[in-house]
Amino acid sequence: MEADWDELSRIQVPPPSPHGMPTIATAIAFDDVMELLWVGNEYGRITSFCGPELQRYTSVRAHPVSEGPVRQILFHDRGVISLSSKSVHMITRRGLTQWHITHEDMTDLRCMSFTAQLNKVIVAGCQKAMFTIDIDKGHIVDKLPTEYNYTMMKKSRYLCAATDTGSVNALSLTDFRVVKSWKAHGTAVNDMDARNDLLVTCGFSVRHLGSPIVDPLANVYDLKTLSPLPPIPFHAGAAYVRMHPKLHTTSFVASQTGQLQVVDLMNPNAINLRQANVSFMLGIDLSPSGEALAINDAECAIHLWGSPSKVHFNEMSKEVEFADVPARPPPLDWSPDTPLSMIGMPYYHERLFSAWPSHLVFEIGSPPAPIDQALIPYLRPAEIGHYAPNPKKTRRNQVENTRALANSEPALIAPKFLSEKAREQSKAKSDGLVTDAAETLAGTKLNGEAEDDPLLKYSNVEIKYSRFGVDDFDFRFYNQTKFSGLETHIANSFTNALLQLFKFIPLIRNVALQHAASACIFENCLLCEMGYLFDMLEKADGQNCQATNLLKTFGSFREASSLGLLEENLTNKSLSTSIQSVNRFFLGQISHDFRMILPSSDDLDHKLATVASESIRCMFCQKEIVRPGNSLVNELIYPAIDIKQIRRNPAYRFSNILRASIERETQNRGWCNYCRRYQQVAIRKTVHRMPLVMMLNTALNNPIYRRLWAIPGWLPEAVGLVVDAGQILCFEGEDLRMRMQNNMPGLVVYELVGVVSEIDIPEHQKAHLVSFINVSISSREPETTNKWHLFNDFLVTEVDKDEALRFNQPWKVPCVLAYQVKDARHAMDDNWKNVLDTTLLYRDWSLNGGRSVESLATLSEEEKPTPGTPVALDTEFVDLEKAEIDVKADGSQEIVRPSKSGLARVSVLRGSGTREGVPFIDDYITIKETIVDYVTQYSGIKPGDLDPRTSQHNLVPLKVAYKKLWLLLNLGCVFVGHGLASDFRKINIQVPKCQTVDTQYLFFHPGKNRRLSLRYLAWAVFKEYIQEEPTDNNQGHDSIEDARMALRLWKKFQEYEDAGVVSQILEELFREGSKLGFRPPARNGATAVLSRPGTAVTMQNNSGRNTPSTPEVTAPTASAPTTPRQGFRRSVALTPSNGSFAPGTGDFFGGSPLK
């Protein structure tokens, strides 16, 4: 027994019935095949427990209750053998019965043991016969008469059998004759064990004509010489004994009171004592490995002893077979509207109960009305339940129709898809009708109520997807302003409102863009991502945007996950509390990111940090220490509220609460280094400098504080602060205006930029966040009036100031406030465009040192991009998530969430100059997320291409690839490509139309509702095949090849324009293309379709991406001179607007802007 042996677990012996009391264990034994401990009880049931935790495994009724307790358990490779007074039973370890043997002469069986043949056991008892049983066949082989009543047996060199008179007989293993007999104990043998050449017994003797007592000696016998050895003294009374399976001369001896002694038989003085916590011990057993000891006590408990560091029942155990986990039945959406055919019913011949006539259907059992959340703070416990004052929101005896509320439609109905509007417009024109395709928010009804319901714009907004994807959704229905909204259906998009607030704070916006323009290439830089997002929102000019890259970076921070700030951690959490924590995290992280590039600069701290010091004074010893107490966010601290004085007490004014929150004097318990213990300490904050941007968390964790915010005009648009000798003076309203007129020294005026609020409309809508922002502060031109806007994800609309700053509604809770110094109004600094760090464009950057294509050459200083420089672009993507599709009962499908793609490769080529068509960027992007599909057929990306350990390509982080494109964008480059709108959306970058040339729309016929593929155009114009299946001589899909082909098509289109044959070319393209299914024919020597001078064209369906090949088609040949090429001209936008879905209704080119 090692020094750390102790009790590992304790369990109760299972009762005989579900409602019965626990019973004592009459037999315990460790399995020598599996990690199981077997227990037999008084009712003939044997139960097994698995592992050191004694997890219940099997339980079997092996013997009838009338036969009494289970008396012994033996183990064989094939199963477990148990013995009762009148039967022998064998089961598998999983509980299946193998055989059950009874005999008329089996009257009082007590013991059993294996014989010399391992497939046979001998059973005996206090009866006149012994029986030999064949384990394999399950029947009695021999019946042996005996004159002894045997109570227990142990097999070693001999079969040692104890009698009921205290003697021990050594029987021959072959014929079971008595070889030697010892009078071991005066009355009876209580326990014994034999191993190798040693036998140890414990028993009872009578002293002085009294009752039998436990002998204080454990007798030892040498089975090799059949002679006794010196006994083991055990003064507590040797009641139970087990020999150690590995240490041949070591034995465990135990008393009935729980004392355990480990003794060496050859050296009785070397002992190890333990005391088990039992009242009365009934038996012990030692595992075959010697690492575990089981104790059975009189309180119906089994104790497992061993070393916590290692405990195994066997040296080499077989794996325990557990029952298969039953498969859960598929979930069924059972409702009154579910047809029986969806569930599956048996055949029937009578009328079903579901055919109940409709005029006999009555509504009963309506759901109870939900509890008004505004009453929760006022609930008081009663004898039964709780009570609260009546809010008097309904009339007397008026009852809420909860069933109608449960079946109500969403408050804000999604608009029609653009494709549907285009079809309706076409139909309306044919019928002579006029329809309004630009529906406004005022035209939508809320549950059939008034059309001008003010709650509409606060409702949850959700993107709907048609088979054409997100481009078919009418975002202009929700936003007719010049300010862009942010899309949902992105992980952590609940932060959209806070990101919009940051964007409209000029000083934060300037810092983010200046940092993005610097040399920062840190992968998880939140400040860079904010700069990219703010630039995208400004370039979008009212079009919808998405913060995919920023939110992915936010989700990658372990700190954010551990603090529970991610969307996956928001279950049962208040959005108000969460967004305030996110606000604190964002500001702390961007401060850290700023110092990564400019570690010695305090520019950001000057803008965001409240510079202060904290003095901590022990209230016991009066010792005081001072430490820095800078903070990026100030949390409002409210005083005790007296409802009667709430409007008259000046302490309840916002300015006074703000001052107390910044100075912050508190008392709590803390560690005192002088007292060397926890004491009551006073903490006082001394402010030295206030920031230019003051971020405040409202901390409305008590409903009583909402009374202050409900006061009209309580939140001021402007506050004035004065820092004087570590003290703060705060003014608002008339006091502020008076001091501004008097030019008070040191007065700094802050104006409110915006508020992030939680909206929780209790009409089956989930809580969400919106922001109210004064957009005039960030305008580049001075404005005389303040214009407030509501940003509800991608719903953006103008609201008046009173509505934005009114918080008397119970469903509108302010969370985050942002104030900025008034002197920084309109301080929109765009100088970052002149100081772009373009080093990344002129040098190679690689994670793995992977090789680039042989033709790639980075830009030289002589090739520095300038405004109007054309570059050809093509990107490839892989699937990170498959689309989530809802299949309805009628078989129709609705896209709930589209597939999620990840940028995998970016190729950029020179579009002009002597090295035209030569790539200078060809980056593969490493992806840490799980890739569900490489879509190799369309992307050319194969497994292993994006793994730094195996990739042979130039791998870079997404941040590096994105920044290269962002630099080209802001240097004024014009991007030439095919299907660029989809690429830009997946990259998450906003490119103005004046910097885009999309060949998908160049070769577009205004009267044909079809867009042609790059693959088809390449064959038709240049007689070349691209995007083919990979072969030995062809690598298959290649983004460099696609970008170069788009560049050549653009040049060719310019030639068509110079020749004045664009319309004729397009007509013939579509006419001949329709014969070929707008697909290139198979390779058979066929030439291009066109027979006109200078042309060779065909086109394709879908979005211009790798349409499968068609059966072989032969086209006519053409041979003609080409039109003269024209020098490069700066191009304008050729990509349609977001809302233009059906190009057949108009001309995107507007008279060919290339001219």
From Swiss-Prot:
| Domain (Exonuclease): residue spans on this chain | 871-1049
SUPFAM superfamilies the UniProt entry points to: Cysteine proteinases (SSF54001), Quinoprotein alcohol dehydrogenase-like (SSF50998), Ribonuclease H-like (SSF53098)
The record's listing under InterPro entries reads: Exonuclease_RNaseT/DNA_pol3, PAN2, PAN2-PAN3_catalytic_subunit, PAN2_N, PAN2_UCH_dom, Papain-like_cys_pep_sf, Quinoprotein_ADH-like_sf, RNaseH-like_sf
Q: Where is this region: Linker?
A: 316-452
Q: What class of enzyme is it?
A: hydrolase
- Residue span of region Disordered: 1095-1155
Q: How is the cofactor bound?
A: Binds 2 metal cations per subunit in the catalytic exonuclease domain.
Q: Quote the subunit structure annotation.
A: Forms a heterotrimer with an asymmetric homodimer of the regulatory subunit pan3 to form the poly(A)-nuclease (PAN) deadenylation complex.
Q: Which HAMAP family match?
A: PAN2 (MF_03182)
Description of its domains: Contains a pseudo-UCH domain. This ubiquitin C-terminal hydrolase (UCH)-like or ubiquitin specific protease (USP)-like domain is predicted to be catalytically inactive because it lacks the active site catalytic triad characteristic of thiol proteases, with residues at the equivalent structural positions that are incompatible with catalysis, and it cannot bind ubiquitin. It functions as a structural scaffold for intra- and intermolecular interactions in the complex. The linker, or PAN3 interaction domain (PID), between the WD40 repeats and the pseudo-UCH domain mediates interaction with pan3.
Summarize the protein's role.
Catalytic subunit of the poly(A)-nuclease (PAN) deadenylation complex, one of two cytoplasmic mRNA deadenylases involved in mRNA turnover. PAN specifically shortens poly(A) tails of RNA and the activity is stimulated by poly(A)-binding protein pab1. PAN deadenylation is followed by rapid degradation of the shortened mRNA tails by the CCR4-NOT complex. Deadenylated mRNAs are then degraded by two alternative mechanisms, namely exosome-mediated 3'-5' exonucleolytic degradation, or deadenylation-dependent mRNA decaping and subsequent 5'-3' exonucleolytic degradation by xrn1.
The name on file for this protein is PAN2-PAN3 deadenylation complex catalytic subunit pan2
Its taxonomic placement starts with: Eukaryota, Fungi, Dikarya, Ascomycota, Pezizomycotina
